């Protein structure tokens, strides 16, 4: 493969990543609605620690493990941010113990 083909392959993967990110944020919106209805906290430290451990276990080397950890910490941070925004917009911010 030449450089152009490799870059095209990366571009395709990047589009897939964006699509999956948007899909994940859509599910995060649904999670926020559930939390609004049930009064659950946005931040669940145990769940996030379990999630990080789980995705790191899917990697094949230390470099990728560290990268996946950083990636998912950022993704979960953005998910929390979205959930907080939705909770605030819904007027639930003062009623939920988060």
Where in the sequence are the language-model features?
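Domain-level signature for soluble enzymes in the chorismate/prephenate branch of the shikimate pathway
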Residues: 1-98
